[in-house]
Amino acid sequence: MAATRIEKDSMGPIEVPADQLWGAQTQRSLEHFRISQEKMPVALIHALALTKQAAASVNMDLGLLPQERGEAIIAAAKEVLEGKHPTEFPLAIWQTGSGTQSNMNMNEVLANRGSEILGGVRGSERLIHPNDDVNKSQSSNDVFPTAMHVAAVIALSEHLIPELKILQKTLADKAEAYKDIVKIGRTHLQDATPLTLGQEISGWAAMLTHNLKHIEDSIPHVCELALGGTAVGTGLNTHPEYAVRVAKKLAELTNHSFVTAPNKFEALATCDALVHSHGALKGLAASIMKIANDVRWLASGPRCGIGEISIPENEPGSSIMPGKVNPTQCEAVTMLCAQVMGNDVAINIGGASGNFELNVFRPMVINNFLQSVRLLADGMRSFNEHCAVGIEPNRDRITQLLNESLMLVTALNTHIGYDKAAEIAKKAHKEGLTLKQSAMKLGYLTEAEFDEWVRPEDMVGSLK
């Protein structure tokens, strides 16, 4: 039987594995919430450690925490950030909706490890108290939303936005490279008037430009931190300078523009900042799904589909059909976009379900948010590296389909009118004629007039 030690909390003593740094409240959570396999995200754990580091530093500066205890807490928090205690944070996402148990998990680990750093022991005889020292000037109700925002801003700024910019540039470069390749357009999955391949791809690049702005515009609200609001937003048990100072300290530690929330009641009672920001992520998912679907449709074939572009052939596509290659990057990214959209529904429900002074859907909200960021960042990187950079035009196929399109007849609208142009197109379709043959049979224009007026390369912009 594994060795244990006795830890105590306000509910009494409880056995805890002797080789673990966590304490009584973490152990109770482990025993009471054996639900699924999802654990609190590492990014959130690191954000909690950063929050404790900042709080200890400010509490020392304000004379509220003895120097040696504060320095030990900071040293222990740095160890967590360095990845030295990965097994000490075992709690499920599906716990108290305020994240209290994960806050106490961090408090207990830092208290026990800090005690060891000071030469003491872990357990009830430790030299640092998880509540009185590590959690000084704090409540789970302001710590956990603060850590959520810190984790979200870091994930967006350092992981997602760089990948989004790279993919946008790839598409913008492709748009420029293929700006002179005239192809047929399609609306309603039917033939439409011409455009260039560059123009089509430029639309994809512009979508991502807008997505980037929407995401960046959401970040300032997420940079507002609840820390200093304590239990219900009033700041009970905090120094008057604490809230501003601790936000400034977190900004220094992370190099991100964190500020104290101007209204702590909003910061505790809602998840509005993350609801709004994730809405921008959902918008990005919608754009990426559209782009990936367009790519795989345009690359369909190779002989019996549209086949206007080629994409990299990365791996065999079938266990029974030799030589088959599939648009697997497009399939992977559209699946993850669907997951992000599902995450958004759950986040919306969580955001709408806070009662009175505290939202209690927080662990689910931040888990879904961070999963969406990770999926989108990884998905864009994979799609860019293994698909987008390798998009190439199939010029012969593009020319073939362009010349077969009946919608080139639109160029005649300004010369013979809509009704006669429609008659030409319908006759050509019904009798299997070219547009020129149909127009000449109907006697609406000469061959020379047709050649002068129906020029696909002149149909990709406004009238000159």
Swiss-Prot record:
Cell location: Cytoplasm
Site location (Important for catalytic activity): 331
Gene Ontology biological-process annotations: fumarate metabolic process; malate metabolic process; tricarboxylic acid cycle
Catalytic activities: (S)-malate = fumarate + H2O
Disulfide bonds: none
InterPro entries on file: Fum_hydII, Fumarase/histidase_N, Fumarase_C_C, Fumarate_lyase_CS, Fumarate_lyase_fam, Fumarate_lyase_N, L-Aspartase-like
Principal place of residence: cytoplasm
Biological pathway: Carbohydrate metabolism; tricarboxylic acid cycle; (S)-malate from fumarate: step 1/1
Domain of life: Bacteria
Residues bound to substrate: 98-100, 126, 129-132, 139-141, 187, 319, 324-326
Protein role: Involved in the TCA cycle. Catalyzes the stereospecific interconversion of fumarate to L-malate.
Additional observations: There are 2 substrate-binding sites: the catalytic A site, and the non-catalytic B site that may play a role in the transfer of substrate or product between the active site and the solvent. Alternatively, the B site may bind allosteric effectors.
Membership in a protein family: Belongs to the class-II fumarase/aspartase family. Fumarase subfamily.
Protein name: Fumarate hydratase class II
Organism: Photorhabdus laumondii subsp. laumondii (strain DSM 15139 / CIP 105565 / TT01) (Photorhabdus luminescens subsp. laumondii)
Biological classification of the source: Bacteria, Pseudomonadati, Pseudomonadota, Gammaproteobacteria, Enterobacterales
